[in-house]
Design a protein with these regions (language model features):
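Short amphipathic alpha-helical segments
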Residues: 5-11, 54, 125, 129, ...
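Solvent-exposed residues in well-ordered beta-strands and their adjoining turns
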Residues: 1-5, 44-48, 63-65, 76, ...
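Glycine-rich portal/gate segments that line the openings of hydrophobic small-molecule binding cavities
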Residues: 20, 30-78, 131-144
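Amphipathic alpha-helical protein-protein interaction surfaces
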Residues: 15-18, 94, 130
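Hydrophobic ligand-binding cavity/cleft-lining segments
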Residues: 1-40
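Hydrophobic pocket/interface hotspot
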Residues: 9-13, 19, 62, 89, ...
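Beta-strand/loop substructures that line and gate deep hydrophobic ligand-binding cavities in soluble
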Residues: 74-127, 137
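Well-ordered beta-strand positions in beta-sheet-rich domains
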Residues: 1, 55-61, 84-86
């Protein structure tokens, strides 16, 4: 639960270019192409493992649907190519519930793609980065 107005939470979550300033695990975020309500965005983040940080990188098509209070991503480059992500924001008493749903069959690697996604890439990298991102969005939105 994020204890902030839903419009503020949506604004912080959608303002991806500011993420490196408010989320220490993001290396950079830049729009490669802007369109009304989103565009093509390149993102790079660190996945920390204690003192070691593993670099990650991907490009997504991003759509911000303010009416539905959703932010959708379709990963188009990087190891997570073809992954669909949706952030859903729902106003509830006392704040905003945010869910992040990732749908992905895994990389197109013969024999091991789905297994690698299920055992390593999803739980270790995707969940590791997404959970830190959501925690940082919460902290920033509640402070603003």
């Amino acid at each position: 639960m994020i204890r902030a107005p839903i419009d503020r939470v949506l604004q912080v979550a959608a303002d991806v270019e500011r993420w490196p300033q408010i989320l220490s695990h993001y290396r950079w975020v830049r729009f490669l192409e802007r369109r009304n309500g989103g565009g093509t965005v390149e993102m790079a983040a660190w996945r920390p493992f204690g003192a070691f940080r593993y670099p990650t990188w991907w490009v997504s098509e991003m759509i911000v649907d303010r009416g539905a209070r959703e932010i959708r991503y379709r990963h188009v480059r990087g190891i997570t190519r073809r992954m669909d992500v949706v952030w859903r924001l729902v106003a509830e008493p006392g704040g905003v519930a945010v869910t992040i749903v990732h749908e992905w069959a895994g990389p197109a690697w013969p024999f091991i793609g789905a297994l690698a996604a299920r055992l390593v890439i999803g739980p270790v990298f995707i969940h590791g980065i997404a959970s830190r991102t959501l925690a940082g969005i919460k902290k920033h939105a509640e402070r603003a």
